[in-house]
């Protein structure tokens, strides 16, 4: 992987990640872009104890532009990327919810092909995305304001995505996200109750012995969790516990693309041939880099994992009522996790079944 850092016309950082070491990225962005001054603040809810960021600037995001005006496509379309094509590119979000002392937001373009999706990538291309996520995690973790790095992809207009080009985002939070805090609390309680046991290890061992396993390799395992909140919710874990993407060894990095690409393609097949691509939310959960607030728990106790979910309002015919969320945020599923796992095994690639 070759990494090249440069600047856009408005001063934002842009980083190229190339498969070929001899790739040269020396184009200069000469667009008449005004420098954006974005401020944000993080407010803490005194009753719930969690935090929420907000952008203190007028809304101006690009909303569903035609393909010939996509700002994530290569040059020639008045866009952020100035070269004819790219492998993977990351740049600072022009309209961030986190900025300055409140963290940072970045956009990750998985490919220069506007009509592709992550599932269309080759294993080599997908590996490059993993390496880019890892590098950004390392870089952002060194910012004084950053406590947790959150890499994710939302796909589909149903999720609220406003650009069709295959891309994800990275939020570098100045606090520990609520879901991570809940996991750390449970981790600490389990460690105390068992005299040092690790909750993540226990959960993974139990799931691998059960009927909810969807896909398994030598170094990775995907399963529908026993207590899944969403109708189709898959958790993907490395079998060797590591706190973040930086901890993955070469064997795990090499196998990940094959496992993840098959998982994505299964989700695209669950509603049958000829159906449009399935919208989803995919997010990496990494250990916070700041001081953990739970006594007896360290970063190494946390387990890196990817949470992949299909929203309840997608394809209602297949997921009847999918999920009901009441005013008290109590999740109710109409698709049992065991049935969801069975369905995802049914649509395995023919080569995966052999």
Swiss-Prot record:
It holds the Pfam family GalP_UDP_tr_C. Residues 36-72 are annotated as: Disordered. UDP-alpha-D-glucose binds at residues 154, 169, 332. Its cofactor is Zn(2+). It catalyses: alpha-D-galactose 1-phosphate + UDP-alpha-D-glucose = alpha-D-glucose 1-phosphate + UDP-alpha-D-galactose. Zn(2+) binds at residues 70, 73, 114, 165. It is an enzyme of class 2 (transferase). Keywords: Carbohydrate metabolism, Galactose metabolism, Iron, Metal-binding, Nucleotidyltransferase, Transferase, Zinc. PROSITE patterns: GAL_P_UDP_TRANSF_I (PS00117). GO terms for biological process: galactose catabolic process via UDP-galactose, Leloir pathway. One of its GO terms (cellular component) is cytoplasm. One of its GO terms (molecular function) is zinc ion binding. Pathway: Carbohydrate metabolism; galactose metabolism. Binds 1 zinc ion per subunit. InterPro entries: GalP_UDPtransf1, GalP_UDPtransf1_His-AS, GalP_Utransf_C, GalP_Utransf_N, HIT-like_sf. The active site is at 167 (tele-ump-histidine intermediate). Belongs to the galactose-1-phosphate uridylyltransferase type 1 family. NCBIfam families: galT_1. This is Galactose-1-phosphate uridylyltransferase.
């Amino acid at each position: 992987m070759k990494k090249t850092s440069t600047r856009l016309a408005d001063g934002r950082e842009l980083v190229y990640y190339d498969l070929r070491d001899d790739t040269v990225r020396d184009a200069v962005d000469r667009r008449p872009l005004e420098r954006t001054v974005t401020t944000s603040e993080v407010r803490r809810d005194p009753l719930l104890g969690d935090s929420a960021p907000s952008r203190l600037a007028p809304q101006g995001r690009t909303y569903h532009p035609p393909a010939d005006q996509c700002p994530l496509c290569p040059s020639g379309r008045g866009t952020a990327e100035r070269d004819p094509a790219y492998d993977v590119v990351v740049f600072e979000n022009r309209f961030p919810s986190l900025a300055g002392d409140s963290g940072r937001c970045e956009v990750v373009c998985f490919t220069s092909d506007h009509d592709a999706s992550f599932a269309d990538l080759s294993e080599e291309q997908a590996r490059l995305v993993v390496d880019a996520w890892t590098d950004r995690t390392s870089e952002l973790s060194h910012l004084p304001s950053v406590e947790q790095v959150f890499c994710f992809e939302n796909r589909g207009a149903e999720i609220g995505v406003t650009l069709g080009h295959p891309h994800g985002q990275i939020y570098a939070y100045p606090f520990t996200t609520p879901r991570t805090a809940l996991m750390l609390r449970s981790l600490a309680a389990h460690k105390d109750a068992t005299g040092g046991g690790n909750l993540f290890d226990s959960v993974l061992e139990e799931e691998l012995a059960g009927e909810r396993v969807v896909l398994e390799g030598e170094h990775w395992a995907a399963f529908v969790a026993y207590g899944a909140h969403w109708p189709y919710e898959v958790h993907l874990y490395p079998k060797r516990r590591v706190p973040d993407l930086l901890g993955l060894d070469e064997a795990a990095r090499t196998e990940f693309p094959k496992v993840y690409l098959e998982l994505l393609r299964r989700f695209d097949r669950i509603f049958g041939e000829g159906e449009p691509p399935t919208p989803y939310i995919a997010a990496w959960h990494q250990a916070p880099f700041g001081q953990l607030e739970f006594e007896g728990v360290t970063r190494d106790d946390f387990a890196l994992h990817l949470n992949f979910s299909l929203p309840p309002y997608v394809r209602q015919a297949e997921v009847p009522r999918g999920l009901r969320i009441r005013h008290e945020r109590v999740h109710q599923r109409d698709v049992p996790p065991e049935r969801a796992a069975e369905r995802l095994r049914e649509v395995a690639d023919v080569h995966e079944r052999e």
